[in-house]
A protein has these predicted regions:
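Metal-dependent de-N-acetylase/amidase catalytic core
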Residues: 1-107
Length: 107
């Protein structure tokens, strides 16, 4: 509602425009990150949670012959190499007027 001044909401307006970050593509294709988040300590939990999506994991394996967990772990490792940690997720900040900041926002 911050950009819709004629819309009345029961919620408070944010202090300013909220920055937007795009997440890495599934296989890292055509994605140039601006920010990385070290996920080394969380890698096992993230993979465990990912494998809870049985319908997607099984479908990708049966339909495309893709081990989904192995694929994302590989891209996380690659992104980790790029920023000097074991595993990382990559993001790209949306660079538009009023969305920039002078401080780091991601963990």
């Amino acid at each position: 509602t911050a950009t819709l001044p004629n819309y009345k909401s029961k919620y408070k307006q944010p202090a300013k425009m909220v920055p937007i970050y795009y997440m890495d593509t599934l296989a890292g294709v055509n994605f140039n990150p601006t920010d990385y988040v070290d996920i080394t300590e969380e890698i096992d939990l993230k993979l465990q949670m990912l494998n809870c999506h049985e319908s997607q994991v099984v479908w990708m394996r049966d339909h495309d012959g893709i081990d989904f967990a192995d694929m994302v772990k590989t891209i996380w490792k690659y992104r980790g190499y790029q920023c000097g940690v074991a595993y990382a997720e990559a993001f790209r900040q949306c660079q538009v007027y009023l969305k920039g900041t002078t401080k780091r926002l991601l963990p």
